[in-house]
Each structure stands twice: as structure tokens, then as C-alpha cells.
């Protein structure tokens, strides 16, 4: 063997067999540290969850090597016979899980799935309605800083000031006045049940499409804990992570064949090129997991745990927006503790409790300060926390916030936060992740 060939073989051996730790210790170290953070912290960010080892294996598979522009059976590249199997499984499982006639599993994210629907059903300058960001909507539902707010004429609806519930009379009035081409229902920080039937009635009255973004509650819909929008909406979108507990990505569902054709063309070639086949494999695995009876129990536990956490926080003098929760999340009004969301997020983070600052309806604070935090139970429930643990977590949160109130500074109360941190580490140690103890 020549010296050049020997060098090539040696390089190939390293390339195909060396570990991440050997090749890139900096990235390996960052991943190791993140794993440690996840193991030892309580994750209460409502949009986050923990995937199974099976999903991790699928997403980290050699499918990442394959280009597959197009759809199963109609690809622009050869060698797609096996990734076709993967995508077809993902599609069929998604349809079965949500009772839909058509599914597109290629969107790379929640933003891209919503963009694809807009591309399929709207023209620039068209009017659509969406939930105001300050009432619990999403950036892609018409925020002025987002493409959805720049390309279209957006009419936002909101919640009532007295009870923070959706004002369906306002939705109907705005629809009649503005004649939108599309009405978008769904949000990221609304803790009550959505009345899909009423939304469809309003949409039909004004001749609009009804689009539902169920990204946050898809797992609860699949698990029978929230009414499904699929029988009512012209088109539904959802991320595949959050309460659905899959890899990060998006999906679009419809029962209308004509809309399905438009959606497929909008996703590819309209918006994306080659799909991420390793992620689609992870989606397929997550859908299979969600079709099992155990997932229904998981979804029930998510809601039970959220209600327990909300009630515990209320018992410590905190206000919950709308008075409680019917799903996986809640908005906590921090004003009774004289705290802002920014301060509370930082203080809880120092105590190993992860959440995000969040505006509350009619919030007087700036968006990067806020009067509230958003809390969710999907990740903790996946880990095995039950009602007892979430009551304990509620007490720990109150302990940190009370300490913050006494300190009345950005630095917080170091003694209280350290004491809570030790309790959090003890709690998380009883619920190991990925076979890891301690």
C-alpha cells in the first residue's frame, strides 16, 4: 500500500469510527454540560419536553446523509426507496393519530409550517385574523415584527379584560367587519379550552378558511385531553415537539384534498428544498409512541399536574391568569410578589428551576421585563413527576419568589436560592434521565 493510500485509509478509519469526544472535545463538553443541566434542573418551559432514547437514535441516524427532494414515490434523487418507507410511516401514523385524511410531515419548524399554509392559501396583502401576542398568540400569528405581520393585513383578537378568556363575541364582530380570508385559532400562552366549533361557525359565516395552530396542545389532543380541531378546521398545524414529545419540527394536517395539494406544493418546492429525513424518522417514532395507550395516561397526567401546580401557587398568594388551567401551561401573575418576569426567571434559574418570563394580558411592563412567567408540565411529567412532586415544585417556586421579594434586587436572595437548589437536586435525583442515576 502506498503512503498516500495508507494515509487515506487511516483518515477514513478515524472519520467513520472516532467518537465525538475524540474529534471535537469542545462540542462534546458543551453537550455533556447540557445533559447535566437537564438532569439536575426542573424544566418548566411549557414548549419544552424530553424525547425518548428511540427518538434520539432515529434523529441521530445515517438518514441525515440522504437528500430526498419531493415526496415518497416522486423524488428528484435516486436511492430514496428506504427514506420513502420512513416518510410514509410518519404520514400514516400522523393521520391515524389525529384522524386526518392528509398529512405533510416535512416542515422543519413551527414557523415554516405556518408560513407554508399562508403561502398555500393567502396572497400578500390579504386579511387574516389571529390571537394577539399579548393575549397568548404567537409571532407567526400576525406580529408586526414577523413575516406574517409584514406581508398580510392582520386583524388581531384578544381576551376579555375581566376574566382573561377568549372574547368570542369580539372574534365574530371583527370577522364580520373585516371579512378575513383566513381565521387562525390557537396560541402559545392560553390555558383554557378552545371552542373550535364556534370558530368554524364564524369562519363559515364570513367565508374564511379556519386554520388551527395546535402546536402547544397537540399531545393533549392526541391523548384525548383536549377537543380535536381536526374535524372543524380547514387546515391544522402543529409542531412535533412540545406536548407531542417528538423531535423539533412541524406538521400540517387537513381533510380537504384540494387544500392538501396546495399545502404540498407550498412546502416543496414553495418554501423548502430537501426534507430532513433523520428528523422525519424521529417524528415517525414519536407518533408511534403517541399511538400507544400509555400516551393517553401521560396526557392526563400532564393536565392533572398543571392543575395541581396552579392550585399550589395560588395557595401561596400568586395569581394565575384566567384563574387556572385546562391544559399543560399557566401564566403566573407575579405582581402580588412585587416581582417582574425578568427577575423571577433569573432567580428561579439560580435555584435550578427553568422557566421563561412572559407577558400577561394587558401587561404594563415591557416585553423583555414582563409581569409574569409561563410554566408548563410536559417535561416534568415525562420525567415521572406526579401531583405530589408538582405541589412540592409550587412550594419551591413560592419560596424563591418570597426570598426575591425580601431582597428586592436583581441579585435575588442567595441563601434562599441555594437552599431551594439543593432541594431541587434531591428531587431530580429521584427521577433519572436516560438511565443516569444522581
Swiss-Prot record:
CDD domains from the UniProt entry: SHMT
BP-aspect Gene Ontology terms: glycine biosynthetic process from serine; tetrahydrofolate interconversion
Keyword field: Amino-acid biosynthesis, Cytoplasm, One-carbon metabolism, Pyridoxal phosphate, Transferase
SUPFAM superfamilies: PLP-dependent transferases (SSF53383)
Main localization, broad class: cytoplasm
Pfam family of the protein (one): SHMT
Catalytic activity: (6R)-5,10-methylene-5,6,7,8-tetrahydrofolate + glycine + H2O = (6S)-5,6,7,8-tetrahydrofolate + L-serine
EC number: 2.1.2.1
Function: Catalyzes the reversible interconversion of serine and glycine with tetrahydrofolate (THF) serving as the one-carbon carrier. This reaction serves as the major source of one-carbon groups required for the biosynthesis of purines, thymidylate, methionine, and other important biomolecules. Also exhibits THF-independent aldolase activity toward beta-hydroxyamino acids, producing glycine and aldehydes, via a retro-aldol mechanism.
Assembly mode: Homodimer.
Name the UniProt record assigns to this protein: Serine hydroxymethyltransferase
Provenance organism: Brucella abortus (strain 2308)
